[in-house]
């Protein structure tokens, strides 16, 4: 349990699923006013091309959702209290086109809420056979400076390398913040060519649709790999929001 003051907001949308925002109040209000809020994000939705089929979403994006939950649990157990405000976001409707995060961004822009940095956790638990564990550091639709900062974090807090990769479109909720002009970054389970997309998507003509194969019992699903993202996330918020 966190020692810092926390509050939870259920951010409602026109569609049934809400976005969940956990706000952790920093001890230094002046610092928050100067910097803005530090955000860790993940999308909580999953989808299947055929609506009647299951869409378990263990990796996309149960893994990112759990990464945030475990980060929060570990920080609370350690007695962490931030100096500046931190938020944990679980977005709705990412699979529909970043709809939940875009609605949150629009709300923050409208209310003039400053954002110091945002890091997205989307697909964090798969290691392809015959490959070594790596972070896939996305270099497009992100903040170059914040991306470089993540490389420094990995060197100091992890024992696996970061490998640059491109997705060629705004592939997850970080892109909503990038479009609004706020610094955002995205690290995934591996470089694009070695991530789990081939297992959980099926190619139909020229489009990719999620299937019911995205389960935690598939070969390559790795909770130890997910734990590395938890450590990286902890480093991200502690280094940026500090430890009061």
Language-model-detected regions and their locations in the chain:
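Soluble metallo-hydrolase cores and metallopeptidase-like ectodomains found primarily
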Residues: 1-54, 73
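Surface-exposed patches in mature extracellular/periplasmic domains of secreted proteins
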Residues: 1-10, 83-86, 160-167, 244
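Loop/turn elements at helix/coil->beta-strand transitions in domains of secreted/extracellular proteins
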Residues: 2, 34-38, 82-87, 112-117, ...
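Active-site-proximal beta-strand/loop segments in catalytic clefts of secreted hydrolases
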Residues: 9, 24-26, 41-45, 71-72, ...
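Extracellular/periplasmic catalytic domains that process cell-envelope and extracellular macromolecules
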Residues: 12-16, 24-34, 80-83, 97, ...
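Acidic/histidine-rich catalytic neighborhood of metal-dependent amide-processing enzymes
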Residues: 16-19, 48-145, 149, 170
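Active-site-adjacent substrate-binding region
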Residues: 124-244
């Amino acid at each position: 349990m966190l020692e810092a003051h926390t509050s939870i907001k259920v951010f409602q949308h026109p569609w049934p699923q809400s976005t969940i925002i956990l706000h952790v109040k920093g001890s230094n209000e002046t610092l928050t006013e100067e910097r803005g809020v530090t955000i860790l994000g993940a999308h909580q939705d999953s989808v299947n091309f055929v609506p009647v089929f299951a869409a378990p979403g263990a990796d996309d994006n149960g893994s990112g959702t759990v990464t945030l939950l475990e980060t929060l649990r570990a920080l609370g157990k350690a007695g962490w209290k931030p100096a500046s405000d931190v938020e944990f976001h679980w977005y709705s409707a990412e699979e529909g086109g970043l709809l939940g995060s875009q609605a949150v961004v629009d709300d923050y822009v409208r209310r003039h809420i400053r954002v110091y940095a945002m890091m997205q956790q989307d697909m964090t638990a798969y290691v392809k056979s015959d490959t070594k564990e790596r972070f896939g550091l996305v270099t497009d639709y992100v903040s170059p400076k914040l991306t470089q900062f993540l490389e420094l974090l990995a060197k100091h807090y992890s024992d696996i390398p970061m490998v640059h990769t491109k997705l060629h479109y705004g592939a997850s909720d970080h892109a909503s913040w990038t479009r609004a002009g706020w610094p955002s970054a995205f690290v995934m389970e591996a470089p694009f060519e070695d991530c789990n997309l081939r297992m959980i998507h099926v190619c139909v003509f020229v489009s990719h649709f999620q299937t019911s194969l995205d389960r935690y019992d598939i070969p390559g699903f790795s909770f130890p790999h997910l734990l590395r993202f938890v450590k990286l996330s902890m480093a991200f918020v502690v280094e940026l929001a500090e430890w009061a």
